[in-house]
């Protein structure tokens, strides 16, 4: 049995969890398998009534539940622009803890949304360009700023 998780950093804002769930549901339809939404941290503190009555979950307890229910493979899909410390530090530590308890469970972690060392994948740029075009007013020349959360890690900001 396999369990697939779309994972973000986590937030105390309900809208962030609802958005992650929306994307996971859409992804489930595209890949033909259930993709579960989970955050690395924080989201489990959001009151359930703010996220549709279904408590938000963090990845650690979610993967342990799946392993207890017989999962032998965990696939983690990072919903991150680049290799933040959450992906290079916390996530491997958390998955190592899982594998200490469930050594038969194989864990695979996909690349973040942008892999600066891989081929130039411009799908995200095309998606953003489509979003800009949707907001254009005829006859105007927009000025566009692309802003993210930011990071002190050069590998993350390089993307």
Predicted feature residues:
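Active-site-proximal alpha-helix that buttresses catalytic centers in soluble enzyme cores
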Residues: 1-159
């Amino acid at each position: 049995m396999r369990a697939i998780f779309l994972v973000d950093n986590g937030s105390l804002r309900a809208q962030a969890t609802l958005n992650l769930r929306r994307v996971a549901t859409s992804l489930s339809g595209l890949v033909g398998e259930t993709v579960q939404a989970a955050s690395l941290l924080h989201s489990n503190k959001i009151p359930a009534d703010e996220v549709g009555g279904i408590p938000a979950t963090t990845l650690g307890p979610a993967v342990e539940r799946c392993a207890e229910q017989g999962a032998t493979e965990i696939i983690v899909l990072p919903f991150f622009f680049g290799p933040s410390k959450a992906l290079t530090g916390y996530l491997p530590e958390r998955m190592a803890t899982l594998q200490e308890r469930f050594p038969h469970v194989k864990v695979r972690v996909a690349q973040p949304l942008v892999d600066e060392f891989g081929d130039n994948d411009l799908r995200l740029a095309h998606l953003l360009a489509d979003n800009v075009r949707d907001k254009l007013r005829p006859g105007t020349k927009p000025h566009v700023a692309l802003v993210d959360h930011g990071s002190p890690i050069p590998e993350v900001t390089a993307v």
